[in-house]
Amino acid sequence: MHSRLKFLAYLHFICASSIFWPEFSSAQQQQQTVSLTEKIPLGAIFEQGTDDVQSAFKYAMLNHNLNVSSRRFELQAYVDVINTADAFKLSRLICNQFSRGVYSMLGAVSPDSFDTLHSYSNTFQMPFVTPWFPEKVLAPSSGLLDFAISMRPDYHQAIIDTIQYYGWQSIIYLYDSHDGLLRLQQIYQELKPGNETFRVQMVKRIANVTMAIEFLHTLEDLGRFSKKRIVLDCPAEMAKEIIVQHVRDIKLGRRTYHYLLSGLVMDNHWPSDVVEFGAINITGFRIVDSNRRAVRDFHDSRKRLEPSGQSQSQNAGGPNSLPAISAQAALMYDAVFVLVEAFNRILRKKPDQFRSNHLQRRSHGGSSSSSATGTNESSALLDCNTSKGWVTPWEQGEKISRVLRKVEIDGLSGEIRFDEDGRRINYTLHVVEMSVNSTLQQVAEWRDDAGLLPLHSHNYASSSRSASASTGDYDRNHTYIVSSLLEEPYLSLKQYTYGESLVGNDRFEGYCKDLADMLAAQLGIKYEIRLVQDGNYGAENQYAPGGWDGMVGELIRKEADIAISAMTITAERERVIDFSKPFMTLGISIMIKKPVKQTPGVFSFLNPLSQEIWISVILSYVGVSFVLYFVTRFPPYEWRIVRRPQADSTAQQPPGIIGGATLSEPQAHVPPVPPNEFTMLNSFWYSLAAFMQQGCDITPPSIAGRIAAAVWWFFTIILISSYTANLAAFLTVERMVAPIKTPEDLTMQTDVNYGTLLYGSTWEFFRRSQIGLHNKMWEYMNANQHHSVHTYDEGIRRVRQSKGKYALLVESPKNEYVNARPPCDTMKVGRNIDTKGFGVATPIGSPLRKRLNEAVLTLKENGELLRIRNKWWFDKTECNLDQETSTPNELSLSNVAGIYYILIGGLLLAVIVAIMEFFCRNKTPQLKSPGSNGSAGGVPGMLASSTYQRDSLSDAIMHSQAKLAMQASSEYDERLVGVELASNVRYQYSM
């Protein structure tokens, strides 16, 4: 209730700028320069406590005035809110409205105030449109034109038919006003003739809820276990409170009571958190059908106008729901547009119809004297305080009133038409029952021209149609009309050869044709297939006979007996026709263009590991190399002291002779050098060898170095094993990468557009869904309706031509069928978004429904439905359905080209580096011998030459051979000495 008041207050705020209130300036009125064809004043009078009706009036005014592109005029409203039924005060207020130059009156007042307003309306011939009034002062047979028109239809006959529908023989009538007593009189007069057993058991006028509960206690004392059928004729809020107090009262029973709410109170909001509403039998009437397009558009516009801060403070309908509009508010909203249509009709025939009146009223300036302006008295503003002894009616009042009776529009309360007496005709009421959580379930439909039409067989119903439906009796000799439409693979025209004549059902083939044959065999009936005339499945259409088009409309109009096609079972269709058990289960799926298979790249061998892992491996390699270098600096086991030979010992060792060269001996005074094998370059070389799982000449002897090496080995063996396993799959299996894989992907990207069939069942599913993902998809599709299509063929063509930039939301059977047909360039991705089914449709109450249900279940259990589906979907496929995508292929050169490139590049790099080293070595300048200048470092007799010669390529080779020979002929420490000696070798060549 609080959220509803907030919304009403918000509408009050947004409409204030478009509506003139009683406090207005006559000077501002005189400054207006627009013509009457652009502005028409209206007077409105409301009783206090009618906030929802006032808000509906203001919103209707705003809705019309904002429609600048199509409206012919603008409405101005002068609104008065009264809190008294005093006739004198009300008369002054009415006269004040007349003096403002209004063209019609609107409002909602109490029955006591209505009599005064009604009298003034007829006296001054001022049209008065109201959502409801109790009883007309003028009888229809009086022959006089009544200038008051009520938007609320007469529903006392609906009460009578509902009582008969439930089979009640007695009722208890509770009412709160004189109007209710008059309705009781009409009910009694209609029911009594020919139904002597019917009786009104008790009648009680109640003033408040307490009085009603006390009366119920009296009924309980008189007969606790007797059935009590109570017709409750009171406002909605009082009816709600009575029911709540009844259920909470432990002294009152529940199962023995059944309430029939006579007013249109079921359109009001009934909170779902009040569990008492579902604990007792409640039946009522609704005039606002939420499935009508006009009502949906009204609620959509209300959502757009709703403040964002109130979105979470709504009722239990959900965070995005809005309070239900009451019947009185809907009728007030329709009243404004009835007047708008009447003025449009007048201005279409004669655009300047009101121009003279407007100029004369403008020049009158609100004065009661017309002589000053030179205008005709009949054209002046209406004056209630005339002293002439007679009243002057408004000259346009009769014309407007007669045009009002000819208005035909579609409003929130359904089709709006009037008879010559101004009474609503051709209207529809919904008979609903309330269940748990205040859920309303429609059980029947009442029309003023057809009476009560049950939607389903009811326990209390005794109609022959319901009886036949329950027993399943049908005429087996009758040829039943089966409505369908052409859509592969469900139904198509059979291709015939030359000279072949196809007639009747033999002209068709497809899944639905086979299904119809099997159902006819199960039921033992004959049938004839007829294509639906408009080519539609069936949607609500106010311009179609019966309110629906397509196959649904044909079933409603009894033009067909059965409909077999790919028609989805929906709650909206179930309201007007019957469905069998689903013969096919499906869901909304995503169709995209099949992506081109990716050919392996040159460096496809890198694909098994992501880019992040490769970067991590490189960083790990560098890090381990640095760690090895540093941890081998500190332990003493990584260092070896070279034992240099002394002067006395060196003389005993003969110089080494290699290739005619004399190996000189080092000087005794050179200090010892502690060498370490793990230099920076050797550390990197060791880490690389371990990573490549190859050997290396050096190993860390220290514990720290070996720990570092061990963890690096463990790391590499796991990484190499994982890489090898993934590499096999990446190199031998070709893959297709789709841009969209799940429905969530659609909402998280902007490259791929998507849509569905406009106004189809998929469109309605997203519009009604309250799931967050579906809401995002609906907002996108509703804002980009150009991405949706009018036919599935158009959507499939767009998918194929979009180069992967368009996705179509289509039912899964259609998706699978198209994917299995040439050119085989589409595919289904992701899971189904919802679950629904196709069903065989029949008119409501058809005797075939029960047997069709049994037949469908039988065909499903024995596998016939699966067989014919495979026949039309997969057995005739011309595509491979991507079976090759999971089959390993032999490796081609393109799969491993990258490693050849690396091999060739590495070899070329090695050759280039070798050449560079050679030239750099040859360009090294000559070095003086340490002993050539007679210094202490000289060693006489070591070599004949006192200087190093530039080494030739053969010199370098002999240098390496000497080093290897000495390493192989000595122990570990002696090897180190040989290495040191080899590093100081001098060669002397004989010339």
From Swiss-Prot:
Keyword Zinc among record annotations: no
Region annotation (Disordered) ranges: 300-321, 354-379
Domain of life: Eukaryota
Signal peptide interval: 1-27
Principal cellular location given in the protein's record: membrane
This protein's GO CC annotations: ionotropic glutamate receptor complex; plasma membrane; postsynaptic density membrane
Keyword Membrane part of the UniProt annotation: yes
GO biological process, one term: monoatomic cation transport
InterPro entries, A to Z: ANF_lig-bd_rcpt, Glu/Gly-bd, Ionotropic_Glu_rcpt, Iontro_rcpt_C, Peripla_BP_I
Keywords from the named record: Cell membrane, Glycoprotein, Ion channel, Ion transport, Ligand-gated ion channel, Membrane, Postsynaptic cell membrane, Receptor, Signal, Synapse, Transmembrane, Transmembrane helix, Transport
Sequence ranges of Low complexity compositional bias: 365-379
Segments on the Cytoplasmic side according to the record's topology features: 633-710, 917-991
Family matches, as SUPFAM superfamilies: Periplasmic binding protein-like I, Periplasmic binding protein-like II
Record field: compositional bias (Polar residues): 308-318
Entry-linked Pfam families: ANF_receptor, Lig_chan, Lig_chan-Glu_bd
Residue ranges annotated as Extracellular topological domain: 28-611, 732-895
Record GO terms (molecular function): glutamate receptor activity; kainate selective glutamate receptor activity; transmitter-gated monoatomic ion channel activity involved in regulation of postsynaptic membrane potential
Family: Belongs to the glutamate-gated ion channel (TC 1.A.10.1) family.
Quaternary structure and interacting proteins, as annotated: Homooligomer.
Function per UniProt: Receptor for glutamate. L-glutamate acts as an excitatory neurotransmitter at many synapses in the central nervous system. The postsynaptic actions of Glu are mediated by a variety of receptors that are named according to their selective agonists. Forms ligand-gated ion channels which are activated by kainate.
Protein name: Glutamate receptor 1
Native organism: Drosophila melanogaster (Fruit fly)
